Amino acid sequence: MSESPYKSGTTHFGFRDVAAKDKQKLVGQVFTSVARNYDLMNDLMSMGVHRAWKRYYVATAQVKPGDRVLDLAGGTGDIAALLKERVGVEGSVVLGDINAGMLSVGRDRLTNRGLVLGLDYVQCNAEALPFPDNSFDLVTIAFGLRNVTDKDAGLREMYRVLKVGGQARVLEFSEVTADWFKPIYDFHSFKILPKLGKLFANDSDSYQYLAESIRKHPPQEELKAMMGQAGFERCHYKNLTGGIVSIHSGYKL
């Protein structure tokens, strides 16, 4: 297990080294800036494919009617909405996010869609979740783990709040596996994406950070090992779209 960033004193914020205690605030500023344009941001970052990734991510989760699910870094609520369809009226979904602006957007959007019952919204830090042990049948985090300062702590908390037999699933931008595609992907990420952010959201800096944060995120095998170190068993991952994203899964047994 790697040393906590809080003990070493520094961590990365994109390609910059910053004090570990400052990263949460810096990431918060990014997501406060992009909250109202979050879906646009995902469209630009994924070239529009993120919607299909998310549908597959939820469709392949072992979630059933009556389950209680925690969706961390739930953002604008698109994953929570898909999960609520699957748990039905007997089940419940808690949408957790550290950023109040993102949480507000998610609540408004789901309420406007008529999704009210069985949905709760909690502002929380993934590194110190305000839930008892063994609370959820499924814990998800989509495009959020790379922004957590202490990822090991976040994974341990996901494990703690899962019920025995429960599953954790991580959907995240990952390491591209096709060598021929890497230069194309890098060009899009570092040359095109910030310009699109400036053009459509008047915010190139946030999009530059988000591209850099993907490159600093642990690659597939490393994240799989981290999940095992956090206590998860039967850990595995599946690459989507040539490794642009991957889905990692682990169980509390």
Swiss-Prot record:
PANTHER family: 2-METHOXY-6-POLYPRENYL-1,4-BENZOQUINOL METHYLASE, MITOCHONDRIAL, METHYLTRANSFERASE. GO terms for biological process: aerobic respiration; menaquinone biosynthetic process; methylation. S-adenosyl-L-methionine binds at residues 76, 97, 125-126. The gene is ubiE. CDD domains: AdoMet_MTases. Keywords: Menaquinone biosynthesis, Methyltransferase, S-adenosyl-L-methionine, Transferase, Ubiquinone biosynthesis. It holds the Pfam family Ubie_methyltran. Its EC number is 2.1.1.163, 2.1.1.201. Belongs to the class I-like SAM-binding methyltransferase superfamily. MenG/UbiE family. Methyltransferase required for the conversion of demethylmenaquinol (DMKH2) to menaquinol (MKH2) and the conversion of 2-polyprenyl-6-methoxy-1,4-benzoquinol (DDMQH2) to 2-polyprenyl-3-methyl-6-methoxy-1,4-benzoquinol (DMQH2). It comes from Stenotrophomonas maltophilia (strain R551-3). Pathway: Quinol/quinone metabolism; menaquinone biosynthesis; menaquinol from 1,4-dihydroxy-2-naphthoate: step 2/2; Cofactor biosynthesis; ubiquinone biosynthesis. GO terms for molecular function: 2-methoxy-6-polyprenyl-1,4-benzoquinol methyltransferase activity; demethylmenaquinone methyltransferase activity. The lineage of its organism: Bacteria, Pseudomonadati, Pseudomonadota, Gammaproteobacteria, Lysobacterales. InterPro entries: SAM-dependent_MTases_sf, UbiE/COQ5_MeTrFase, UbiE/COQ5_MeTrFase_CS. This is Ubiquinone/menaquinone biosynthesis C-methyltransferase UbiE. It catalyses: a 2-demethylmenaquinol + S-adenosyl-L-methionine = a menaquinol + S-adenosyl-L-homocysteine + H(+); a 2-methoxy-6-(all-trans-polyprenyl)benzene-1,4-diol + S-adenosyl-L-methionine = a 5-methoxy-2-methyl-3-(all-trans-polyprenyl)benzene-1,4-diol + S-adenosyl-L-homocysteine + H(+). It comes from the Bacteria.
